[in-house]
Amino acid sequence: GVGRLSLDRLLPLLEEAAVLGIPAIALFPVTPPELKSPDGSEALNPDNLMCRAVRAIKAALPDLGVICDVALDPYTTHGQDGLIDDEGYVLNDETLAVLAQQALVQAEAGCDVIAPSDMMDGRIGVIRKTLDEAGLHHTRIMSYAAKYASAFYGPFRDAVGSSGALGKRGKETYQLDPANTDEALREVA
């Protein structure tokens, strides 16, 4: 099972984790349906759930590392990781600027490691440039070098509330085919 925790339940659990010597935790948001939009604008809100959680964690446990997911699927009405056109095709280049701004608001909230799970081509360079221009040189980026358009992500999509919005659409246009090992090896090289 996948658990979801509100902020009031999260902090006591993280205090236990810190006592156990766990150095960092990863956050994935669940966005209420009324805050979702086609462009995922809630991802850019400096007072969204993710940013509030980061600030609360850093206030209570400043030495605990915080890893923040960067992707639009928890914030979009269509469940895709990026912006889409009228036919539902994901717009890679247009999405990059939004992802960079999402990473920026998370880093400004205190996130230690940005983890872009969206799989848009070129995202790492654009995010790094945006963070550096804002003086956030020490914010690290954890690259998802290879991510598959696989049913194994079903529980995750359920957890962040994006699976229902996807319907019959998939993420094959920007995530790897699990059967294509050659492509996976090229991506991670």
In which residue ranges do the predicted regions lie?
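Alpha/beta enzyme core
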Residues: 1-189
